[in-house]
Amino acid sequence: MRADKIHISQFEFLTLECLEIDREVGEHATAFISGYIRDKDVEVYRGKLLERMWVNITGEDEEGNTQNLMTGLIAGFSLEPQPHATRLTLTLKSGTFLMDGNKHYRSFQDTGLTYLEVLKTINQSYGEADVKVNGGLEASTIDFLLQYNETDWEFIRRIASRFGMAVTPAITREGAYYFVGNANFSTYTMSESTRYSVSKRVDSYMTQGGSGSNPLMEQDYMEYRITSRDIYDLWDRLVLGNEGGYVCKIQIKYVHEELTHTYTLRPINGMRVMLKSNMDQTGCSFLASVSEVRQDRVKIELAGDENTGQNRTKWFPYSTGYSSPDGAGWYCMPEPGDRVRLQIPDQMEEHGYVISSVHMETGKDRKNPDHKSFKTKYGKELLFTPDSVELTNNKGMSISIKDEEGIQIISNKDISISSRGNMTVSSEDASLVIAGKKQINIKQGGSGLLIDKDITFTGGKIRIQ
């Protein structure tokens, strides 16, 4: 189809001064419209422009056939008085522009979710929105995804890049509709007289070509450009003899009442997208609370996470003070409810791990920084002070080692000391005191000493010197 007439919905232009439409794989579609309207329509149009409004740009050929060139949301406008008329300028954006406004902070911790289900979850907040995918997103499940300081559009493009795929806005309906991967395309064979230019993106090849698990070849960075009055779509395959490629960019201009299209083509491998990363999250720590603990892993709830009602099945490794592959090290897990931090060491949030617990409020036992303690929720405590070490259950039992006073063992229950070898109790420079409120009983085999008001010796022979 070759369009000769242009129709702009919602507005009646006396003359159309300028029309430009730019479309590119991975970017919002943009249209720029400029023309003259009647002065009497200015007030009515001003009221419309202050509301959210969708505009259809339609092309019509000589036979009356029409085709939607773009349905876009008004993203900007101006009204400029001119002699005998008013110039109206409009800037339109594809519906995906709605997804590129607010930055979000949310996590996806359900390891049973597919990437497609994640995208559909994001789409829900936009009402009129949907996605069509091609290339594995509907079958591949996530491990852990973190959207930090990213718009939904940035996050969606980053997800798609994990599969080497681009995101293409749909422009023929109102709403946030888009494709991930190869949009439905058709193949067209251009005439032999078609003129085209050829170029190579050498800079892109030098920075991208040899990297990744599936490196691209130099010829994958070839680009072909043709200008035509025929209307094609992104991802359409245009054959130019033995060359050609897939449409990755379209520039439409309406000049002298004639609509022309400039198409940029790339080989299919050249349509692949390199892995995108969120550099803002690299090296960051995020406050969280522990919800469950198992072995050396924890489940967490991130503070401020927008995705509050999700099913959390992701187990994060917990970092301790020291750990080695053979199992040696420090094993000390946090308790449910403890405040911790999620550490993201690099560009992949799946590599994140949980680190040290954070004490948010000062307790009565945390007043003196010279005191170091290790305490469980059951009250068992190991306390280090500048002049002592104390092990206690805080229920009447303790062992104290004090620099000035020595060692003290206190128990409100039995104390049992046993040995299969020799046992020596001695005092080299002072006294040895054995005291019992009821009795003292010392035994060895059949011999013994019993002190219970009276003193009783038992044995085959008793020698007193």
Give residue spans per PLM region:
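Surface-exposed cap/loop segments at beta↔alpha junctions
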Residues: E43-D130, F144-L145
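Amphipathic, non-transmembrane alpha-helical segments in extracytoplasmic/periplasmic proteins
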Residues: I33-S34, L92, R106-D130, Y148-P169, ...
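Exposed beta-strand/loop interface patches that mediate assembly or binding
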Residues: Y246-K253, E257-P386
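Short beta-strand-centered interaction patches in the first periplasmic/extracellular domains
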Residues: R87, S94-T96, G135-K200, H351-I355
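Surface-exposed, non-catalytic interaction/assembly patches
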Residues: D100-Q109, E154-R157, S161, V180-L234, ...
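Short beta-strand-centered aromatic/proline hotspots
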Residues: N68-L79, E243-K253, A288
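Right-handed beta-helix
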Residues: I122, R157-I159, P169, R229-Y232, ...
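Juxtamembrane "anchor/assembly" segments of surface/extracellular structural proteins
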Residues: M1-R52, K93-F97, G181-D230, E243-K253, ...
